[in-house]
Amino acid sequence: NLIFTTGAWTGKILPSYQNKLIPERQVMGWFDTQKSSMFLPKQFPVWTMLVPEGRFYGFPEFQSPGFKIGLYHHLFENVDPDELDRSLITEKDEQVLRNCVSEYFPDANNQMIHGKVCMFTNTPDEDFIVDRIPEFPQIIVAAGFSGHGFKFCSVIGEIVASLATESEIDLDIEMFRVSRF
């Protein structure tokens, strides 16, 4: 068996998956907290919130300076993973994040001290694909984790290992089947 866990490049490697796995540019920013203890892990959790401006997420200040914030589907920019400029953060990118910080986290509405560009790989329904390729059942695909697959790595690993070793899977994986598209 062959296992593809090629992230944003899966649609390029397996063209039949191009419309099922869409790489999207994502931007995160770290805003100066002025050393406020309010944004440290003991007082401030990892969070996500749905507000009229979108679905934001963030992290407390931990191991590097700044309160981290991002917006799911940042500017809705689908990208070619080979052509993404990971070094370019625009004024518009910063403004999208700053608007949220100023509205909901005013104590961190300071200088953006660091920014980072990455990719999320989304499926049309935003659920993962973990399945065999129907035309080539010896090939397994695990992709479309949209920046949060790491939270599920133990169970995804178990599913992929079961598929690869042709062992019985004790979990219902219908929601991850590629046939849903």
Indicate residue ranges for each PLM-predicted region.
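Active-site substrate-recognition segment that forms the wall
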Residues: 4, 8-135
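C-terminal catalytic lobe of FAD-dependent flavoproteins
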Residues: 99-181
